[in-house]
Amino acid sequence: MNTANASLPPRGALRYLSLCVLTTLYSPLATASEPEPVTTLQTITFNARQYTPAKQTENVRHDSSVKVQQADLLNQYLPTVAGVNVGGTSGMDQHIYIRGLGSDNAGSALKITVDGVRQPETRGFHHAGISGLDPDLYKTTEVSVGNNSVTLGNNAIGGGVAFTTVDAQDLLLPDQKMGAKVKLGYASNDQQFQRSLTTYAKPNDQLDMIVSYSERDSDGGEDGKSNHIQGDDITIKNILAKVNVMPAEGHKITASYQSYDNDGNYPFRPNIGYQANLPANIHPGYTNNETYALGYEYKPHSNFELNSKIYHLTNESLSQGLRGTTPMRIATSGKTDGMTASIKQQLTQHHGDHALTHTLNYGVEGYKKSATLESSDITEDATSVGVYLQDRIELGRFALTPGVRFDHYKPSERLSSDDYNQLSGALAGEFKLTPNHSLFASYTQLFNGPPLPETIHQSGQTFVNKDLEAETGANAELGISSRFQGVFDSQDSMSLTAKVFDTQYDNKIDRLTGIDCATGNTVTGGQCASYINAGETTVKGYELSAKYRLNNMRLNAGYAHAKSETEQGYQLNKDSGDQLNLGFNYDINDKFSLGSAIRHVKGLTRRTSATAVADLPSFTTYDVFGSYRPSALPQLTVDAGVYNLTDAYYYEHVSNTGDKAMGRNVKVALSYQF
């Protein structure tokens, strides 16, 4: 039995609190006609579609530039969140990173879900991505920048990203019982042509349903120097089908199906870029995900909510090409079967003139993941079960949130003869200095069971380290949040947030190559790879954000800094330079809206070993976009924009240096709703 230390004292106190104030916070994600996005102490929520105010629920929904930009990849909108980067240019190589941690060849450090369904956590091939995700299907994206809650659990030491898909009630116009939306889009750089049809209905209060199909064709596109990128003859298809049944007051049953299919001629090693794979390593490849889910919700009143879900996800991928002079065909498959159940309950006690409120959040999550290399008979799997209890206690201006979680993680016998058990705790606090100014702090213990090896290395190319320890650690944060009214004008408002963080990781897992396949030792000419515990790693930094609004105008800005240091004095290989985001949005009237965005990433010298030093250049991108809805045809919306306006030639710091980003891109989309 391998039992991780359940009591991890903080090693390294937070030494500073940055109170830098910016006059604007980046988020071209909102328009003045809708309320602010939901921003809690540790979680950012924003939306990717347009909704009528009458349909708003707990998460405040609003217009966002995701719709205007017609984002088809995560890298086109997620980096607007301070502390978040997305590597990979194509849909075959998308990787989310939060403060330098994400989905890499050492496993996944982020919990990524769609409608509560955990996405695949194991790569088929270390040069490719984990899963395909399409922003066009989502209505909200919730980003946990860092792990600050016992609710996240295993495979979430860096935080999490939760996508939620659209429902019929989100799209129905006032007084409609059924409707449809047709969308046509074109992007100039990769000559992408998009078409989609979404139908939805709510015939009565007991039933609503939605079916959506979209398809995109493209040829890959070019970088800022007119070099071809991504691939050729690419077709991406998406299907979403969802039915909600409300058999009685407070009860809801949801059945859903999602499918993502990406097929095209792709580089054998997508992450090193198209040009580096020429001339012989461009071949047909694909990735496909299918998800079936069944959920139940019980909400008899506003103080009690139960949510449960069971799901089955399958994924397949194919990469083929030459490894040296040897032809390779890497066909992989995997599946994840899981269940979740959680309860949120609010209890209030009155003590004289004071009210003591408990908001309880408790639940269980279990899932089994497996991965298979089709050319072998080996399947690796792992099972994870976690239970948690969290209580937010509010009294006057004080709020305290203790939490506790127990995780049990069991990989297959071939990987380890042990199981892993971890008892983790968390404590967060908030103090309202005034109704508009709050201090907050949190401390969360972390756990991440050893990952399944990438599927390709199940064919004898991995030395199995059965002594691998689980990753553990702790994340501490401290910050201040303020809101102001009437700053420069009686009608304006401003919000400011600043926080610092200090995250310690023990037994950080890393993947090494050049390993002797028999002994596991590092040798010259070693043909195997292996996973090791590389020791302690520290990530420290700060994130600043602000938001200004005056009538129909918004100015926004955000700044993020994170720096890692390993036990050997080096950095993580996905450290990124400091990032500044600026944005402007203006609703001219109910027909026209305009926006712009600037993103600057500072240059960085990244040293990951004694001999590996990379000088990563800075880059700046500029976007302009707008939307028009003609009075004579209000059901029609025209969205247009120019992205990477200056045709900058660059690569993301979390991408391979050869994986260049897309150059200037002009997008136009027509949407008709009836």
Where does each model-flagged region fall?
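N-terminal periplasmic "start-of-domain" segments of outer-membrane beta-barrel proteins
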Residues: 41-69, 94-95
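Extracytoplasmic beta-strand/coil segments of soluble accessory domains associated
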Residues: 75-117
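Short acidic/polar hinge/loop motifs at secondary-structure boundaries
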Residues: 118-147
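Outer-membrane beta-barrel translocator/receptor signature
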Residues: 137-140, 145, 150-225, 232-239
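Membrane-embedded beta-barrel scaffold of Gram-negative outer-membrane proteins
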Residues: 184, 299, 305-321, 439-440, ...
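Flexible loop and strand-edge segments within Gram-negative outer membrane beta-barrel domains
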Residues: 220, 224-226, 230-232, 236, ...
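Surface-exposed extracellular loop regions of Gram-negative outer-membrane beta-barrel proteins
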Residues: 261-265, 269-275, 410, 431-477, ...
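Gram-negative outer-membrane beta-barrel transporters
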Residues: 358-360, 395-400, 493-504, 523-609, ...
